[in-house]
Structures are given as C-alpha cells and as structure tokens.
C-alpha cells in the first residue's frame, strides 16, 4: 500500500504559501469565450431541465413476430412485423382512468394489468396498485380485486394465471377473477421476505425487485425466502413535515455481519393446496459454510438451474435439478454440479454470469475466465473442466442474448480493440467449427459503436439499440438475414435541437505508464486550442467491475462544463475496472483504495505533460465509490489538485454492505483483512485535506451508502481542525434525485468549481 507522507512546513514555507494564496485570491476571474461561432453554449438550465435527453425503443415482444409498444400519447399499440398490421390494443383513456404508468399483457391476450400509484422503495423495488382489465369485455375485472399496495406481480408464461407478493407473502390466482390462494405465510416486515429480495440481495446480488420465477409451462413457481431475523438494523431519521421525524429501519448486513438465511422453494401451482412448496437442496460444498444464492434459470418445464456462491465469493456452484414425480421432490445430483473458481480474485465479474441452455436442455453456454484471464464464452456439456471455449482473444465477451437451434447472439468489446465499445455478434453453432459474424460493426460506424439488443423468443426478429457515440438510434432487424427492416427511433427532434448548440469534442484514447495501459475519455471545450491552458476536472468512479470510458452519447453536467465554462473533463479507467482481463480487474483485490487512486494521479500527470492543462486549476469529483476515490486522491499529498467534490462517498468498507465489501476485500477480521479495512478509510487521511478545498455532499436518507460515512469524514476533519465545505440534502436517498434537490446540488457544485477555477459567473 502507498505510504501517505505528512508534509511539514517551516516558517519560510508558510510565508511563501501565504503569498501564493494572496496571489490566487487577487487574480481576476477568467471568462471562457469561444470565438468564431454563432451557436450558443449549453446552459446549466438545459441540463437540469433535461432539454437534450434522448429516446430509445425496446419492443415488448409477445411472439416471434409481434410486439407491443407504448406510444408518446400513452396508447398501447400492437404491431405485427410480417403483416405490417398495427392497432391500439389499449387506449390512453383506459390507462388514464386509473392513472396507469405501466402495463402487462397476459400470454393468452385476454387481460392486461395496469400499474399505478408507483411508490419507489430502493434501487429496483417499488410498490404499486394493480388493476386487471378484460380486453374481450372491455371492462375492469370486478370481484376478488387485488390488495394494495402490491410489492410485485407477474403473469404466468401461459394463460392468464398470475402471482403476486403482498406484505412479503406470495399469492396465486388461477384467473384474474378467481379468489387468491396464499402460498406462503411466513412473511414479516423487515424479517422474512418471500418472492422479493431483502435490501442487500436486491442491491448487490440479484439486481431485481423480484425473487420468483415461473417454469416455461406455468406449472411450477420457484421462489426464494430471505430470513433477515438476525441481521443488524440500520436506522436513520426521515424528517418529513411532521413535528417528530420518523425512523427508517432496514436489515442491512455490513462487512463481517450476519447475512440473510436463504432457502429456495418450488410449488406446483396446478394443485397448490394438495402439495405445499418443496425446498430445493443446497449443494454440500456450499452448505458447509456461509453462502449466497445468486440466480435461478428454468431449463425446461421440470428442470431448473440454481447458482450458489460461497461467502468468500471466489467459488460458485451451478446446480441442475430435476423434478421427481415419484418422490414429488426436486433432485440435484452431484454429477450435475459445475464449479467455477477464481484463484486471483472473485468469481465472475460484478455478478457471476448466468447460463444460456441449448435446445437439448442439458448443455449450455456460459461466460467465464479462460486460462489467459479473459472472460469468454464456453460450451459445457458434461463438466466445466471439459468445457469447449467458443470465443478467445485479449478482449471480453460481455453478455449472451439468445441461443437458438443454429445461432448464438452475444455482445463483446472485440472490434478494433476498444474496451468501451459494444458490438453484437452471431455465432453459427450448427457449423463445425462455428463461424462468427459481427452484426453491428459496420452499421453506421461513426454514429454507433455501443449497442445492446432485444430479441424475440427464438430470435426471428430483433431490435438494435445504439447508444452512441453519435445520437442514439433504434432499429428493427430480421434475425435470419440481419437486414434492417425499419428505423424505430432516430431522435430527429433532438438532432434538430442540437444544431444550434456548441457541443464539446469527445476523444477516447489510451495512455501508457510503464507496463500499464489506461483508457481515457477527454471532453474538450468548443474551439479547443492546444496552445492555451485550460482547467481540468477529473470525473471518477473507479469501482471494481465498473467502466466509465464508453463510446456513448451524453449531454449532461460535464458536457455543460466543457461547453459553457471551458473546462477540460477527463474520465480514466484505472486498475480494477472491467472488460480488460482479470489481471487488470483483480489488481485491486483485497486492497481497495490503492491502485484506483494511484492510477488517477498517474493520468493527471500525463495530462499535464500534454501541455494544455493549467497545473494550478485541477479538480476531481465523484459519486459513491467515485466519492471515495476522489476523497483519497485529494488526500494523497501530491499537490496535484486544488479542489474536489465527494458526493455520497463510502468512507470505510466496514460501513458498507457485506456482499459488496467482502467480494473485493475479504472479511474485516484479524485473521483475514482487517488491517487493510482500517488503513483504507478516508478518515485515516484527514490531516492531508489541509491544502485542498473539499466539498462533501450527502443525502440524509441514503439507504445505500449511509450518511454515517460522511458524518465520520466530517468528524475526522473537525478533529484534525481541517476547514472544509459540506452540504446535506434532507430526506434524499443515494441519488439525491428529487427535482429541487437535484437542481440545488448541481447549481451548488457548479458554483464551487467556478470559484475554485476563478471563473466568472
């Protein structure tokens, strides 16, 4: 770990420093004025109002050639690609009658659920009121109406059977008008969750609001029970408008704390009252110590695949289970367990990848690290040891979209060697050897270098959504020939709006330092002149498995800072970031807060060498993990930064969630990694903030990175008698996302930076 040296000033040095400070204060403000252009610069108001936001188009597939889409006037429209038929399946007046903001069509197309009264809970979860509309009769279903608010609701894959979660218990309806059947009875607020994840699983493992899955034929329903009874509670005040604040309590396991106890059950929904839920056994090698459930995939109507992780998270076990009619139980034989282990870090990327099963319901494709440490697609038929590697190279496969009888569609960053690009590829798996084709590499090449896709069930048709670097565009394609059929959304209105705007120039390049290569994105002011000197703002996230340097379009706060204020912005992907191989990724394993910071400092020095950066006007800012890195960079004692901002920063990994902290740091125990947990805190660097201007920001109702983190930083700075600025946002969560708070936040940060850089208002 880097040694943090304390600088001692003598009397002469102090006098010289005082003189420098006086000179800086007296220096006149600077105004950035792009010349020779009649276009206007972006304004902060443009950003806060979302004036230049873009649209995407994702079809809601209901068959191989049919999909639904919600129009701009909120009609739900049916489309048939082959017949070119389109019509309104549900009118906006019906939507408005219950103030619906979302919908879901039953697979038999007889009913639609309408979602209203959306109330956000955590990152993915929310509650809502649901109404069922009968399309054939043109009226809402009356009798045995759904309770409110519901935590999650979904249709079965066939017919119009539905399951929902209410007050942490799961209920089943065979038809929308039927009385509900209660499947679970153990649900209790903040203690036992059925069919929905608790806080830590939602945020750090599943990344969903649900934890239940229908079998393909709708016969079985699998669900997870999370028991949080023994988990410590995080409590914080929500001030509201009342005389007394109320207390929010969340079971929240921090590093080293007791974790949720998870059990997976499957219930036969055809006769749920005859045979209750059946528990699926945990693999022995996992059950012998603390473990996590990581995902569930239905393979066929009577075969299911479960994934488990050891608490240390370097060993993952994939277990394939079959329904035994004679036992009326689920059997998970040991010879159907596949183990994935990392010897250099943690298993998988941010999450362990999920399998994409073949038509035979036995073999599957999965992304994991090859012998060279790059994540690639492998074909597993019997054991992981005998896996056949499908892709290879010093790049990474990102995601498998679809596996059909003769094709596999996936995304990667292979093309032209840019880690921050995404293209869609097709592998013809019926051929020997398999042949590979890049579907998107040469489509609108200048405009589109970062794609995702949405496929119909058997990939007969698919939509491509390009996110940049030019204006986003969504297109429909034939899955057999890859030919473009139709442009779904091309953002023409946005294109016209931007014609009179001075946008900055964006460059994505790489810099080398010793044997390391760092990719960076630099946003340069309009009419950029290399012979001049510009202030520099580093925007950092830097967390493990993250990526900031991406070829995507954006008009946001940093775009404004470059366009209007003449600030050069740089984003750098240092060690620990994703999609450049395990050696680069796992460099930060068990030592967070070291290389992420060092690599930002290295990049700043390289940028100064380019000749157009004003060394006296360099700042850094970040949010969440980025707030942690920006804080440590400011306290590095290098003198590179004049000022910086940390929004909702982690300040100690002992304060953060067990699943996340332990994945990258191990356990905070003496016989594991307690020493680095203690050494890597922001508080340990409090003395080194003396010579920088530091703005610390946090929401008081942050359920993710608790306000405790910033409170401890502030306490350490006060104890060290270090001056700093702070801003808190009452009742705001991790995103500080309410309109007025967000406006205040970005206005305040802008004023801080302009003062730091001596820029005129």
Curated annotation (Swiss-Prot):
Reaction catalyzed: Hydrolysis of Pro-|-Xaa >> Ala-|-Xaa in oligopeptides; Release of an N-terminal dipeptide, Xaa-Yaa-|-Zaa-, from a polypeptide, preferentially when Yaa is Pro, provided Zaa is neither Pro nor hydroxyproline
The keyword Nucleotidyltransferase is assigned to this record: no
Highest taxon in the source lineage: Eukaryota
Annotated disulfide bonds: 321-332, 438-441, 448-466, 643-756
Residue intervals annotated with topology Cytoplasmic: 1-4
Organism expressing this protein natively: Mus musculus (Mouse)
Extracellular compartment residues: 26-761
Name of protein: Prolyl endopeptidase FAP
Entry binding sites for substrate: 203-204
Any GO molecular function: protein homodimerization activity
Tissue specificity of this protein: Expressed strongly in uterus, pancreas, submaxillary gland and skin, less in lymph node, ovary, skeletal muscle, adrenal and bone marrow. Expressed in reactive stromal fibroblast in epithelial cancers. Expressed in melanocytes but not melanomas (at protein level). Detected in fibroblasts, in placenta, uterus, embryos from day 7-19 and in newborn mice (P1).
Coiled coil: none
Name of the gene encoding the protein in the UniProt record: Fap
Subunit organization: Homodimer; homodimerization is required for activity of both plasma membrane and soluble forms. The monomer is inactive. Heterodimer with DPP4. Interacts with PLAUR; the interaction occurs at the cell surface of invadopodia membranes. Interacts with ITGB1. Interacts with ITGA3. Associates with integrin alpha-3/beta-1; the association occurs in a collagen-dependent manner at the cell surface of invadopodia membranes.
Site, Cleavage: residue positions: 23-24
InterPro entries: AB_hydrolase_fold (IPR029058), Pept_S9_AS (IPR002471), Peptidase_S9_cat (IPR001375), Peptidase_S9B_N (IPR002469), Serine_Prot_S9B/DPPIV (IPR050278)
Function statement: Cell surface glycoprotein serine protease that participates in extracellular matrix degradation and involved in many cellular processes including tissue remodeling, fibrosis, wound healing, inflammation and tumor growth. Both plasma membrane and soluble forms exhibit post-proline cleaving endopeptidase activity, with a marked preference for Ala/Ser-Gly-Pro-Ser/Asn/Ala consensus sequences, on substrate such as alpha-2-antiplasmin SERPINF2 and SPRY2.
GO biological process: angiogenesis; cell adhesion; endothelial cell migration; melanocyte apoptotic process; melanocyte proliferation; negative regulation of cell proliferation involved in contact inhibition; negative regulation of extracellular matrix disassembly; negative regulation of extracellular matrix organization
Glycoprotein listed as a keyword: yes
Short name of one Pfam family: DPPIV_N
Modification comment: N-glycosylated. The N-terminus may be blocked.
Gene disruption: observed consequences: No visible phenotype. Mice are viable and fertile and display no overt developmental defects and no general change in cancer susceptibility.
């Amino acid at each position: 770990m880097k040694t943090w040296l304390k600088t001692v000033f003598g009397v002469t040095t102090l006098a010289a420093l005082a003189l420098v400070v006086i000179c800086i204060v007296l220096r006149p403000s600077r105004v950035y004025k792009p010349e020779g252009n009649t276009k206007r610069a972006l304004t902060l108001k443009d950003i806060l109002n979302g004036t230049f936001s873009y649209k995407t188009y994702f079809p809601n597939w209901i068959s191989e050639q049919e999909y639904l889409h919600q129009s701009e006037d909120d009609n739900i429209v049916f489309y048939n690609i082959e017949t070119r038929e389109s019509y309104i399946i549900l009118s906006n007046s019906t939507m408005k009658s219950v103030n619906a903001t979302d919908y879901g069509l039953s697979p038999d197309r007889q009913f639609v659920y309408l979602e209203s009264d959306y109330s956000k809970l955590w990152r993915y979860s929310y509650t809502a009121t649901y109404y069922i509309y009968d399309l054939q009769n043109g009226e809402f279903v009356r009798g045995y109406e759904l309770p409110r608010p519901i935590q999650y609701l979904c249709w079965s894959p066939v017919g119009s059977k539905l399951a929902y979660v209410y007050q942490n218990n799961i209920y089943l309806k065979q038809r929308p008008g039927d009385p509900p059947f209660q499947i679970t009875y153990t649900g209790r607020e903040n203690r036992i969750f059925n069919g929905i994840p608790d806080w830590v699983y939602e945020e750090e493992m599943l990344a969903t609001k649900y934890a239940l899955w229908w079998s393909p034929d709708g016969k079985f329903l699998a669900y997870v029970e999370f028991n949080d009874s023994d988990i410590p509670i995080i409590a914080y005040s929500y001030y509201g408008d009342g005389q007394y604040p109320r207390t929010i309590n969340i079971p929240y396991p921090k590093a080293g704390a007791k974790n949720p106890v998870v059990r997976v059950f499957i219930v036969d929904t055809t006769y749920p009252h005859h045979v209750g839920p059946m528990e699926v056994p945990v693999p022995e090698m996992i059950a012998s110590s603390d473990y996590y459930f990581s995902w569930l995939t239905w393979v066929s109507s009577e075969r299911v695949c479960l994934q488990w992780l050891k608490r240390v998270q370097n060993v993952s076990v994939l277990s394939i289970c079959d329904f035994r009619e004679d036992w009326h139980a689920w059997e998970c034989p040991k010879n159907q367990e596949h183990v994935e282990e990392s010897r250099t870090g943690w298993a998988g990327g941010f999450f362990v990848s999920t399998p994409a099963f073949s038509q035979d319901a036995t073999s599957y494709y999965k992304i994991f690290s090859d012998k060279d440490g790059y994540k690639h697609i492998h074909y597993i038929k019997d054991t992981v040891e005998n896996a056949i590697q499908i892709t290879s190279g010093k790049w990474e496969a990102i995601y498998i979209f679809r596996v059909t009888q003769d094709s596999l569609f996936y995304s990667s960053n292979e093309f032209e060697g840019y880690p921050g690009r995404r293209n869609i590829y097709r592998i013809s798996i019926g051929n020997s050897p398999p042949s590979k084709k890049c579907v998107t590499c040469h489509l609108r090449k200048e405009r589109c270098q970062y794609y995702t896709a949405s496929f119909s069930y058997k990939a007969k048709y698919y939509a491509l959504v390009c996110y940049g670097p030019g204006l986003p565009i969504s297109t429909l394609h034939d899955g057999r020939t890859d030919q473009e059929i139709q442009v779904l959304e091309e953002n023409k209105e946005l294109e016209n709006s931007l014609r009179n705007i001075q946008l900055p120039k964006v460059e994505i390049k790489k810099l080398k330092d010793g044997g390391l290569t760092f990719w960076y994105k630099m946003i340069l002011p309009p009419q950029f002149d290399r012979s001049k000197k510009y202030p520099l703002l580093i925007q950092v996230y830097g967390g493990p498995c993250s990526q900031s340097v991406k070829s995507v379009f954006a008009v946001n706060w940093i775009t404004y800072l470059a366009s209007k204020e003449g600030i050069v912005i740089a984003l750098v992907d240092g060690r620990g970031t994703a999609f450049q191989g395990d050696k680069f990724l796992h460099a930060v394993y068990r030592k967070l807060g070291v290389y992420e910071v060092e690599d930002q400092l290295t990049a700043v020095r390289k940028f100064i060498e380019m000749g157009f950066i004003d060394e006296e006007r360099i700042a850094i800012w970040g949010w969440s993990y980025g707030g942690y890195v920006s804080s440590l960079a400011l306290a590095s004692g290098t003198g590179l930064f004049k000022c910086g901002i940390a929004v909702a920063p982690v300040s100690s990994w002992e304060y953060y969630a067990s699943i996340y902290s332990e994945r990258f740091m191990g356990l905070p125990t003496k016989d594991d990694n307690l020493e680095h947990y203690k050494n890597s805190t922001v508080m340990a660097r409090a003395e080194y903030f003396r010579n920088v201007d530091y703005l610390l920001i946090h929401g008081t109702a942050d359920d993710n990175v608790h306000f405790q983190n910033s409170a401890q930083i502030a306490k350490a700075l006060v104890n060290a008698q270090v001056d700093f600025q702070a801003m808190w946002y009452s009742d705001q969560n991790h995103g500080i996302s309410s309109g007025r708070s967000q406006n205040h936040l970005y206005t305040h940060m802008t004023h801080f930076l302009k003062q730091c850089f001596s820029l005129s208002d």
